[in-house]
Amino acid sequence: MKIIITLLAISAIVYSGCQQSRLVPQPLNFTENPVDVPNPDRGFYRPQTFVLPVESDTVPRLTNLSTTIAGTDVWVDARIVYMAFDLKNFSSNAPLNGLPLGEWSPEGARPPEYGKTQPLTPAALDYVRAALQNLRDSEAVAIVKFSYDGRGYTYNNRGGYDLPLHDCEPGAPQGRVWYETGVEEESDLCGIPGHEEKNWVQYHMWQLGHVFSEFEDVIMVVKGGLFGPWGEMHSSSYARTAEGYHWLLNALLGYVPESRSILVHAGGVMAWHNVEYGTNYSFTNLMPAPAPGTPAQRFGMRNDSYSKGGEGYTDGGSLSEGFRLIGGDYDRNAALTWIRNQNNFYGGETVRSGNEPENMYPRFPNVPYEAAYARTTHLNTSYSSAAYVNWADFIYTEENITAPFTPPHDGVTRTAIFDPVYDGKNGMEYMRDRMGFRLVLREAMASESVNQTGTLRFEGKIQNVGFGLIVNKKNVSVLLKPKSGSSHFAALTDIDARDWRPDLDSRATNTSAWRDVRFSIDMGAFGDVPPGEYDIYLKINDPKETSATKRSIRFANYDIWNADLGANRIGSVKVTS
């Protein structure tokens, strides 16, 4: 296939030229197709664990992207892999194969084996690279997490216990030695020449930072999961201090590419902000929406018990995590507002609270109502079936979805909005399709004809009917493809797809939520375009994407996606000489 690409920045809003052909309506279908539309950076994810080896003895493989969602028969073609990298082999405080001994241990039990605190070896780093290269070769992007206790062995929640045991991070003060002797570690510094000021976690982050940069194109977001069991940022000595969050988040801000965000939680971010900037934010003195491009705006939210509700309405502690570091107060509405204000990624996994018949939080209509407000972007395909079966059993009708409900955390009666596009579908199909962004072309006007030396113009409207935003910057290019032939011509615009923001009302009739998409492009930017009839396409992908068509954003319209181009047809034009 012949491809001629000229990467020139083209004004998306300023029109040039003296004699312009008139704009004419394009004969396209501007309605939404209510089906699974696979796109990067949003939707259900496939979880996968990788244990970093000390020596090269294993080859990482990637999980299948397509699956049925747990507890349902709803199919999804996922475009996110949650890559949980376990660093347990590189911490002397990380049990390798079981819980530390305690009153729960059977008679004659032996203690577990432990890792060894040391730098990440070349084999370990190459293993991460190989896993991310497998991902790059697929159609997916990654949520990347590194932790020291992926199996949660330093927290006993088995057999009726609910007890943190000891720190899992290398060098942490209350690790294995403290657990066995009561004596804390004197220092957590790594002692590596040239890095004497770094503790072991910071040093490992420094090592991994090089890998982050190499695979920036396929990393959706990095989860700040280095503290505590399961990497859930609780229970560890480090996670119990504002200073711990301060040095960790600063390290992540430094080592994660500037174009990528970091998932933590509201309490930890406000604790970091209070130390870094001398503020006094809390759930009753909420941190305001940070300015785009600032360090504070790079933080999204990971919820490990999404929509659980539960005691204190904290989602099992996920929404309130870190509240003791910022004044000891908590409010569910404030937590959700903080998430919304961050204009970033929000998601995680549900839990077994679906088995609680009186709990409205993991049920419709509360689930989509809160998801739209907090701008939910991603959830786990595998966990938990107990919650997901309720979503699949819910029939999405106007009567069902608009039934008033009153969450007990504030006693305010709410009503969700009915979108007739999904009438008769089930709740899981609605959640599958609405998570993150979902773009529908609503209007299209293009130049009827354009001279080879003229200016191609387009004016249209796009509606983001999803819950969430386009968070990561994308290139938006215009392609011209002859109606007969396989070549195409491309020009890069300066359109910012992140401006296509969602609205709480996603219905097509809400024209105030339709966002402008306009461009005016000198034909010379495409190169030497022969006269003829052309289709106009919009291609949206990551600026550092290395493939021709992978990970391009697909609109949810009928009959406009071209898989060979990885682009959406938005009209046609006649090029004249």
Question: What residue ranges belong to the model's regions?
Answer:
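Sec-dependent signal peptide recognition
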Residues: 1-7
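Extracellular/luminal regions of secreted and cell-surface proteins that mediate adhesion/ECM remodeling
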Residues: 425, 429-577
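An active-site-proximal structural segment forming one wall of the substrate-binding cleft
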Residues: 123-141, 164-221, 244-255
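Catalytic-core regions of glycoside hydrolase
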Residues: 34-52, 57, 221-400
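Loop/turn elements at helix/coil->beta-strand transitions in domains of secreted/extracellular proteins
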Residues: 76-80, 137-142, 215-221, 256-262, ...
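N-terminal substrate-binding region of glycoside hydrolase catalytic domains
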Residues: 23-129, 147, 153-188, 192, ...
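Well-ordered, non-membrane alpha-helical segments in soluble/globular domains
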Residues: 107, 113-131, 195-208, 240-251, ...
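Bacterial Sec-dependent N-terminal signal peptides
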Residues: 7-8, 14-30
